[in-house]
């Protein structure tokens, strides 16, 4: 009874305070995300199966994507997309297909795409445009494996793509 009274008092105070109501709304709206983060912290997050790799991506195809991106952005002939060192792009692409004992380090398309984004942004294989190129290759990899816009809508918004890329 005493705990119920305390809870009622807290709820009453929240309803009277606009800032508290706003915080409560945020907490309720993102409760699932907070639970997932808590499960991760406790080591209880279950790794989703993901989608098996259907189509292998290679460095030559990545270069084609980079050329198309440069053309669409009007930056052909600039430093954009120029490879800084020989083999840098190949290393990034090969890394997403690495494994040990016949087991892929990144078994799903989603994990491979995310790691390709990470490696291109972090390793800077290009003189300019690594974030744009990495995010474009990420989307291309998902699309070529049927995971981008199956229903005509993209599951990744522009804002999400920017946030993912900048968090690398």
Regions found by a protein language model. Give the residues of each.
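FIC/Doc superfamily catalytic core
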Residues: 1-168
